[in-house]
Amino acid sequence: MKQNLRNWCICLSAMLAWTLNAVAGIEVSQTLPTSGTPEHRYTMMNAQGYYCNATTSPTKDAGKYAQFAFYSSKTADTYYVYNVTAKKWLAYDQKKSYTPQTGFVKLVTNKSQAAESRITEINGGSYEIQPYTSNGVGAIYLNWYKGVGVDNPENGTVTLGLWTDNGS
């Protein structure tokens, strides 16, 4: 069976907010990882050409680009993100508010442990990803806080962090 593989990019805007560069919007997968391979897969990339690897750390090595799938939730514009490469769901510790930080994202085994994220179109088919607070509000944005370098080494293991600016 031929698999529909789409390599869209989740881009980090000039203001370091995560965005999804998708021409026709986000295509959610229906097949859960426990039942097969997600139908629609994406790669994550920032504006400087760094992609997320399996741990969501930055890489420019094409052999280390991780693939991600999106699954809808019951709330509009809200999705679960599955790291196809690592075979893990993206999660985070939900709090009343967040501050800029590195290593915010966690990778978990079960969807029941995964966190929902708000994904909003900002311009030209680009999207930004926000974790929800414990009050149900989309908060600040996923990114590599402090950029690629000491705090987020290339091909490292530090997961995505948070920053306050959106992608506009």
Task: Please place each PLM-identified region on the residue numbering.
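Lectin-like carbohydrate-binding module/patch detector with strong preference for beta-trefoil
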Residues: 24-168
